[in-house]
Amino acid sequence: MWGDHSTKRQHIDILAVVMIVVAVRKFIFVCCCLLAAGSALAQAPAYTYRDDHDPDGTGKFYAGREIAQVMGHQGADWLERPERQQEERPDILLQSLPLRPGEVAADIGAGTGYLSWRMAQIVGDKGRVYCVDIQPEMLDLLARKMAEHHTTNFQAVLGAVTDTHLPADSVDVVLMVDVYHEFDHPYEMMQSILRALKPGGRVVWVEYRAEDPEVPIKPLHKMSEAQVRKEAALLPLQFVEAIETLPRQHILIFKKK
């Protein structure tokens, strides 16, 4: 009988040790999660607000820059203006993209699809272009543009101000043309873009040159290379190259780490 009691006591002691180990591991796991979350929050720059601000801005500031107002769908004709071909040279832009046949691209702030259908031609039938916009009216115009060019290898996506609503690990190249400076929540939006990018995927910023006073665009709708790189440095992105072949815009390419 004594042996039976001793064996039971040993089993109880072992069970108690196992329970303690499990509890300690859970505690450590929770602490690590909290530390990681705290670290992420610490790294994310805070948004600030000012009542006295540029009339073309939102009064919301990020990384030392005022966020510009979004161009509404009422201004869609400006995206399709005939002179855009010479002012922005989309042909040169598309030749500069790290985009190949069969790949998946995302046109963020696709608008009327001015660039989307051209990108669809590059990736071909085996590729796909996600056309993301937060305005349903823009996506309606985009659908007409795609039909006009008999483009079928695309998917229109209604995004939100904090989320592209793109599938995770689905995109090779993300293109943002004259849109990033209007993101209401740039940090959250870029986190969403990074989730959608495949490992090693590329993000391409195209913005009017703030360094050039001759570029006839309102100041808040321009960005300097230094400002783009400053904000990209807050994210797990590696700078690849700056291409300055466009008449008025930077092409800044980054790679997901």
What are these regions (language model features)?
Residues 202-229:
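Conserved class I S-adenosyl-L-methionine
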Residues 30-38:
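Bacterial N-terminal signal peptides
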Residues 172-186:
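A short SAM/SAH-binding and catalytic strip from SAM-dependent methyltransferases
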Residues 106, 110-163:
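Class I SAM-dependent methyltransferase SAM/SAH-binding core
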Residues 44-104:
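Class I SAM-dependent transferase core
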Residues 240-241, 245-257:
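Core SAM-dependent methyltransferase catalytic element
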Residues 120-121, 187-202:
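A short glycine-rich, Lys/Arg-flanked "PGG" loop and its adjoining helix->strand segment in the class I
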Residues 164-173:
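A short acidic, Gly/Pro-enriched loop at the edge of an enzyme's catalytic core
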